[in-house]
Amino acid sequence: VITASSAPNIIDPVNGKERFSTSEDIARIARLIDGLPAIDLFSVSVLASDAPAGQYSLSRFYTALKHCRKPVRGSGDPGVDCESILQLAYAIAGSEAAYKARPFITHHYCPVISPLKMDENSTELLMFYTEQGLPSHSTVVPNAGLTSPMTLVSTLAQGNAEFLALAALMQMTKPGTPLLY
C-alpha cells in the first residue's frame, strides 16, 4: 500500500485552515506513515513551500528519509536535482554500491501523457533510473471522456497500451528490468 503524493496545500492540523505545506508537514506525515503497519511505502505526500531555491526535491527527500524508515517514493528533475537525490541516497546507505544493493527510494514518474504521448523529461528520467538498475514506478493516468474514450473498457484498453509502451521502453533500455504493474 502506497500513500498519495505531492499535494501543494494541507489542512493545518492545529487550526483547521488550508495553507501551503512545508517541510515540517512532510516530517509529521513521514513519522505517521513510519508507524502505520498497513502502509508499505511513503510517497512524499505534500510539497515543501519552504524548500531553499534549487533544492526543492532534495529537501523533500531529505525530510522524508530522515523521519521514515520505510522506502520512499518521489521524483526529481533531470540533471543536478536528480544527481543530488542520488548523492543523498549514497550517503545514507554508506556508498553507491550499498545503495544499489538495497535501494530505498522508488523514483516515480508519469512519462505518458494520455492519449498515447510521452513526456520528454519524465521519459528521460525513467530511462536513466532504469539504466542504473534502480527502482522506478511509472503511472499512466487516462481519464475517461477527457484523455481516453468514455467507456470503462476503452479507458482500460488505452491505459494498458500506455503501460505496455513503458514496459517495452524499460526492457529496451535494460533487458530484465523488473516492473510494477
Where are these regions (language model features)?
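Glycine-rich, N-terminal phosphate-binding loop and its surrounding beta-alpha-beta segment
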Residues: 1-14
